[in-house]
């Protein structure tokens, strides 16, 4: 489709009308360029897909929504906007699209949040009920569906009143009533515990109401995991050829795709025996009380017992083999080099893949049959069996995927990382098996790049070390296929708005010097805090261990610090805003997740402290396997893997400071390797251009760690 004059005029008119809706709107050349690039790509005028880096301040969300909606209407397609986190998804759904509706009055949009974000009305009814009989009936379905106390029951009753009165849409983030994680775990549900169409509450269930709205919507706001699953199953979203797809926070896409290729499951022999026995009894119950019209051959008791016995014997053999690789009777881990399993283990995995897939098929067959019996049997007993069969199906689905992945030598031309772990829980040993594909380009090519005609991949950060090469390698996007890669200029003047401070540290932040380095960092931070020049501060760490050591050094000012984990992130940010706006000092302290999606403008954040260059952990089985593979190809893991990842993290961390033209401040990085190592200049070159200062650090006396006493040999 060509971009007609009428279509261009429509996009221009909406953009002009938008300026009247936003106070202090500043027209920006990068934004106009992005609108044009997105329009040309989605209309098929230029290239296959577009990866476009839009720095903070460009206004990327509206830059893809305006042309996306216009072209979707012209082509009678659905615009799907996908994000990596709930916060951005909710911002687009609750803020950006309602704003556009003011200039596009008939705009129809909805959101497809994950099931776990919605309340389950069945669970809510049980927890809100003050009638013991009602609670007993629902507890028959699930033992946890009773309130812990009267206050919790009253809170649930208020939530139910809001839901029934259409004052609440059922999303956790859309109610002012406080819901702690434990309560929400019981209020929500997952696929395995959902009765689906068999549920009495199906028609008014917020999750299914939202799913039905997708069919009528022009714009659907989803998340990457849902989009990947939808492309795999061809469910939830319209057909790929009828989509226009925007992947915001697109740098997360390879990780999300990798998660779909990541399987972990318990394989402890005794636990497995229990699951197989429970499933056999469940099948017997179905045959006795809810006999299907056509009996699956495997439902025959003798055949099923023989099948389960073979599964158990294979699992027991695998446990015995894995125990040879790990120290006896203690927590341990064993990784298989390059993901290569011994022949005997590979044969077991291949056989288990077939056997567990057969059990998955049997569970699915019974579940489909049970779903058709709701009008002819005791509804409570039937629902209980449906729930149990649903959970069995989920377990065998996971096991089937695990053994199928374990049986693969490679995925997307790279090894599959494989390892086993042994944990001790309540005095009992538990064995787990894990598999992760380290490359996912073939999966993305099959599900996205070859299925959806035109896709926009965007983020404030897509490059590392000033290059798209890492994104290309991880995602499979390539110029040879007609994909375009564009990096927009920042609208901000970083030279005037901020500076980069690299204190003259005596120690490098290596593991051997961690104690001394953190003591120096704490001393400089304390000096900055006491100067009272900055009311809003952010401190970012590469590890939880380092963060805790830092907190020990500044324990006397702990009340000023809002630390990740103390409360949900949104509450910490809310409290930070209130403190700064009332003239108080406030310091947010967190890990890498606080370096993304945190938008604090002006006085809310004028100083960012970064503990060190955040290289990926060297003890991760996935990272180690990837390193082995790269070396086998005569590629240098530090250049291909570690340095690009560190550059990406540093760009995101530094990007927290300048969020608008009104922002002023400084970024403090406590890592002298930026100035002393050859790679340091490359990392600096990938950052916005700030003037650099190197102040002295206060003298610190650090007590050396006591070395453990050597045992005298006897």
From Swiss-Prot:
Q: Which InterPro entries match?
A: ATP-dep_Helicase_C (IPR006555), DEAD/DEAH_box_helicase_dom (IPR011545), DinG/Rad3-like (IPR045028), DinG_proteobact (IPR039000), Helic_SF1/SF2_ATP-bd_DinG/Rad3 (IPR014013), Helicase-like_DEXD_c2 (IPR006554), Helicase_ATP-bd (IPR014001), P-loop_NTPase (IPR027417)
Sequence motif: DEAH box, positions: 248-251
Keyword entries, A-Z: 4Fe-4S, ATP-binding, DNA-binding, Helicase, Hydrolase, Iron, Iron-sulfur, Isomerase, Metal-binding, Nucleotide-binding
Any idea which positions bind ATP?
A: 54-61
Cofactor section: [4Fe-4S] cluster
Binding-site residues for [4Fe-4S] cluster, renumbered to this chain? 120, 194, 199, 205
Q: Where is the Helicase C-terminal domain?
A: 517-698
User: What does the record's cofactor remark say about binding?
Assistant: Binds 1 [4Fe-4S] cluster.
Task: State its Enzyme Commission number(s).
Answer: 5.6.2.3
Q: Does the keyword Iron-sulfur apply?
A: yes
* PANTHER family cross-referenced by the UniProt entry: ATP-DEPENDENT DNA HELICASE DING, DNA REPAIR DEAD HELICASE RAD3/XP-D SUBFAMILY MEMBER
Q: Which NCBIfam families match?
A: PRK11747.1
What name does this protein carry?
ATP-dependent DNA helicase DinG
Origin species: Salmonella paratyphi A (strain ATCC 9150 / SARB42)
Q: What is the lineage of its organism?
A: Bacteria, Pseudomonadati, Pseudomonadota, Gammaproteobacteria, Enterobacterales
Q: Which gene encodes it?
A: dinG
């Amino acid at each position: 489709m060509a971009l007609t004059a009428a279509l261009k005029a429509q996009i221009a008119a909406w953009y002009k009308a938008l300026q009247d809706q936003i106070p202090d709107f500043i027209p920006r050349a990068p934004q106009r360029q992005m609108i044009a690039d997105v329009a040309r790509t989605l209309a098929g005028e230029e290239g296959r897909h577009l990866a476009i880096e839009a720095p903070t301040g460009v206004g990327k969300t509206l830059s893809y929504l305006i042309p996306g909606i216009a072209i979707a209407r012209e082509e009678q397609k659905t615009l799907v906007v996908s994000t990596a986190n709930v916060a951005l998804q909710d911002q687009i759904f609750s803020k950006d699209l309602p704003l556009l509706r003011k200039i596009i009055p008939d705009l129809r949009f909805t959101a497809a949040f994950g099931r776990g974000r919605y309340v389950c009305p069945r669970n809510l009814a049980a927890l809100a009920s003050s009638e013991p009989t009602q609670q007993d009936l629902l507890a028959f379905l699930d033992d946890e569906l009773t309130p812990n106390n009267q206050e919790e029951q009253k809170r649930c009753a208020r939530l139910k009143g809001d839901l029934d009165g259409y004052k609440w849409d059922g999303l956790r983030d859309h109610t002012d009533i406080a819901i702690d994680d434990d309560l929400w775990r019981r209020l929500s549900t997952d696929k395995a515990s959902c009765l689906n169409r068999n549920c009495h509450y199906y028609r008014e269930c917020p999750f299914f109401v939202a799913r039905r709205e997708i069919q009528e919507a022009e714009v659907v706001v989803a998340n990457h995991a849902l989009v990947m699953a939808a492309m795999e199953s061809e469910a939830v979203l319209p057909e790929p050829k009828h989509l226009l797809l925007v992947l915001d926070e697109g740098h997360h896409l390879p990780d999300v795709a990798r998660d779909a290729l990541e399987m972990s499951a318990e394989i402890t022999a005794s636990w497995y025996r229990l699951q197989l026995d429970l499933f056999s009894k469940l099948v017997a119950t179905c045959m006795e009380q809810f006999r299907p019209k056509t009996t699956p051959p495997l439902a025959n008791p003798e055949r099923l017992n023989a099948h389960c016995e073979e599964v158990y014997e294979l699992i027991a053999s695998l446990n015995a083999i894995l125990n040879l690789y790990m120290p006896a009777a203690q927590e341990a881990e064993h990784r298989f080099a390059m993901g290569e399993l011994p022949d005997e283990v590979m044969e077991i995995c291949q056989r288990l893949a077939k056997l567990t897939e057969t059990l998955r098929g049997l569970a699915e067959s019974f579940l489909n049959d049970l779903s058709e019996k709701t009008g002819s049997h005791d509804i409570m007993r039937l629902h209980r069996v449906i729930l149990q069969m649903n959970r069995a199906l989920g377990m065998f689905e996971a096991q089937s995927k695990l053994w199928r992945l374990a049986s693969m030598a490679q995925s997307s031309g790279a090894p599959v990382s494989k390892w086993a772990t042994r944990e001790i829980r309540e005095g009992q040993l538990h064995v787990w098996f894990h598999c992760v594909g380290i490359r996912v380009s073939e999966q993305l090519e099959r599900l996205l790049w070859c299925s959806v005609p035109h896709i926009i991949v965007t983020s404030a950060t897509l490059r590392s070390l000033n290059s798209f090469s890492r994104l290309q390698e991880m995602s499979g996007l390539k110029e040879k296929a007609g994909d375009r890669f564009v990096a927009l200029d920042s609208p901000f003047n970083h030279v005037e708005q901020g500076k980069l401070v690299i204190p003259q540290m005596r120690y490098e932040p290596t593991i051997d010097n961690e104690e001394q380095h953190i003591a120096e960092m704490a001393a400089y931070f304390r000096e900055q805090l006491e100067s009272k020049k900055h009311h809003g501060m952010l401190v970012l760490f590469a590890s939880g261990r380092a963060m805790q050591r830092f907190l020990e050094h500044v324990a006397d000012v702990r009340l000023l610090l809002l630390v990740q984990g103390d409360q949900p992130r949104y509450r910490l940010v809310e409290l930070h805003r209130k403190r700064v706006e009332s003239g108080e000092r406030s310091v947010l302290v967190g890990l890498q997740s606080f370096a993304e999606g945190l938008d604090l403008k002006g006085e809310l954040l004028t100083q960012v402290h970064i503990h060190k260059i955040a290289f990926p952990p060297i003890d991760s089985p996935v990272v180690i396997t990837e390193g082995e593979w790269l070396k086998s190809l005569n590629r240098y893991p530090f250049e291909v893997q570690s340095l690009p990842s560190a550059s990406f993290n540093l760009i995101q961390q530094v990007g927290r400071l300048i969020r608008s033209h009104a922002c002023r401040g400084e970024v403090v990085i406590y890592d002298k390797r930026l100035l002393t190592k050859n790679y340091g200049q490359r990392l600096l070159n990938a950052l916005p251009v700030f003037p650099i200062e190197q102040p002295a650090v206060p003298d610190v006396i650090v007590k050396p760690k006591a070395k453990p006493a050597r045992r005298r040999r006897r």
